[in-house]
């Protein structure tokens, strides 16, 4: 009885991965904006998350976000090879948010993908679920009300809370802080 219930949950979570990926992308976009506006944030301290490896860097300089949006999804073979080499938690560390220019979510990929694009023109493909997890870890101690709200919503999405509407664009840029750090 327990086994079949667990198996049913696994199937239903697989079937709703696309919807959950869209919801997570919405809240991750808000977290990226909040992360970039928080002046004194420290990198998350957890040994279970691996730092991104140079081999996952997309092998050319990127001219614009449109180029990343139109890039093909990883094949199932490429995805399985990455998981075999780096594990399912293969994701960037906190230091990889320093010069972040844009984050692009590709929910149409299976599994969904996220691409981090930096001011230097380089881009790194990452697992969007673990990217969101790192953002939550980085922001959990922040006392700002809006940060606490977005973190709680993202945690609710992971726990099977209500889904939210997908944004009109999948190119999400961190908000710019006003002059003087306001």
UniProtKB/Swiss-Prot annotation:
Residues 52-182 form the gL alphaherpesvirus-type domain. Disulfide bonds join 73-109. O-glycosylated, and sialylated. Keywords: Disulfide bond, Fusion of virus membrane with host cell membrane, Fusion of virus membrane with host membrane, Glycoprotein, Host cell membrane, Host Golgi apparatus, Host membrane, Membrane, Signal, Viral envelope protein, Viral penetration into host cytoplasm, Virion, Virus entry into host cell. Pfam families: Herpes_UL1. It comes from the Viruses. One of its GO terms (cellular component) is host cell plasma membrane. It is found in: Virion membrane; Host cell membrane; Host Golgi apparatus, Host trans-Golgi network. The keyword Membrane applies. GO terms for biological process: fusion of virus membrane with host plasma membrane; symbiont entry into host cell. Residues 1-39 form the signal peptide. It is a peripheral membrane protein. The heterodimer glycoprotein H-glycoprotein L is required for the fusion of viral and plasma membranes leading to virus entry into the host cell. Acts as a functional inhibitor of gH and maintains gH in an inhibited form. Upon binding to host integrins, gL dissociates from gH leading to activation of the viral fusion glycoproteins gB and gH. Belongs to the herpesviridae glycoprotein L (gL) family. Alphaherpesvirinae gL subfamily. Interacts with glycoprotein H (gH); this interaction is necessary for the correct processing and cell surface expression of gH. The heterodimer gH/gL seems to interact with gB trimers during fusion. This is Envelope glycoprotein L. It comes from Psittacid herpesvirus 1 (isolate Amazon parrot/-/97-0001/1997) (PsHV-1).
């Amino acid at each position: 009885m327990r086994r079949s219930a667990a198996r049913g949950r696994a199937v239903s979570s697989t079937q709703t991965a696309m919807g959950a990926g869209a919801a997570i992308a919405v809240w991750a976009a808000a977290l990226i904006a909040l992360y970039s506006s928080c002046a004194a944030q420290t990198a998350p301290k957890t040994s279970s998350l691996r730092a991104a490896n140079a081999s996952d860097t997309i092998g050319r300089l990127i001219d614009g976000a449109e180029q990343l949006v139109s890039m093909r999804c990883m094949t199932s073979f490429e995805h399985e090879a990455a998981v075999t080499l780096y594990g399912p938690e293969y994701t960037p560390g906190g230091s990889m948010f320093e010069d972040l220019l844009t984050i692009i979510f590709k929910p149409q990929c299976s599994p969904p993908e996220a691409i981090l694009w930096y001011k230097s023109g380089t881009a790194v493909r990452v697992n969007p679920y673990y990217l969101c997890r790192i953002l939550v870890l980085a922001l959990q101690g922040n006392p700002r009300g809006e940060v606490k709200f977005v973190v709680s919503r993202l945690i609710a999405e992971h726990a099977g809370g209500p889904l939210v509407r997908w944004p009109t664009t999948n190119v999400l840029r961190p908000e710019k802080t006003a002059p003087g750090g306001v």
